[in-house]
């Protein structure tokens, strides 16, 4: 059975999000944050607070939805776990001034596991932006992409991050199952259990 790690929301906010926010700020400069609506909303929302520049507007957050393991209507058993399915995507026909052209786009997710969904997101967003550039003058400003993940699992990945895409992991971890507090129905109970598990782990280490 795979091991599981659990962290409190406060620890993730202070140790993993705030610690890397300064480096991301050098890149962002009023970027747009794109996140998975299920797994990336909490870290994206907290990061936006940390990256807020006094006197400026909030950084816009836009959502994309990708599913790898969820059984969805019109999907086959063979697709689950092997094929990335779009459940929500940007509507470039209605974005107007919110277009990604000429922007710095930070893609936010909880965990970089196999990198199937994250690699898909980067590739497809870059393709969409390239299509937009075909309709613009040759001197249109470039779009830059970067990625922030709360945890990067140290394991073999299904794809490589392009060299022109900056990558900001909050923490590097072994291939463990991560139990995030914002995915729990009772976040207070989750925090209590996470603290108990930490004390138990410390006790086990001391006995060794």
Regions found by a protein language model. Give the residues of each.
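Generic structural signal for small/hydrophobic residues in well-ordered secondary structure
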Residues: 47, 107-110, 180
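Gly/Ser/Thr-rich loops at beta-strand to alpha-helix junctions
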Residues: 34-42, 113-116
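Alpha-helix termini
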Residues: 15-25, 51-56, 91-98, 126-140
């Amino acid at each position: 059975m795979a091991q599981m790690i659990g962290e409190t929301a406060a620890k993730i906010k202070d140790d993993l999000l705030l610690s890397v926010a300064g480096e991301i700020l050098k890149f962002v400069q009023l970027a747009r944050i794109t996140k998975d609506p299920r797994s990336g909303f909490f870290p994206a929302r907290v990061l936006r607070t940390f990256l807020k520049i006094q006197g400026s507007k909030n950084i816009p957050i836009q959502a994309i939805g990708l599913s790898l393991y969820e059984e969805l209507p019109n999907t086959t058993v063979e697709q689950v776990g092997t094929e990335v399915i779009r459940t929500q995507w940007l509507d470039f026909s209605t974005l107007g001034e919110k277009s990604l052209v000429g922007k710095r786009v930070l893609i936010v997710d909880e965990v970089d596991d196999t990198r199937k969904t994250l690699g898909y997101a980067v590739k497809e967003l870059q393709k969409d932006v390239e299509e937009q550039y075909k309709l613009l003058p040759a001197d249109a400003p470039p779009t830059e992409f970067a990625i922030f993940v709360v945890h990067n699992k140290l394991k073999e990945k299904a794809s490589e991050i392009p060299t022109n895409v900056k990558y900001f992991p909050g923490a590097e971890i072994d291939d463990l199952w991560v139990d995030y507090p914002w995915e729990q129905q009772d976040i207070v109970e989750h925090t209590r259990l996470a603290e108990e598990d930490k004390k138990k782990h410390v006790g086990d280490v001391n006995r060794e």
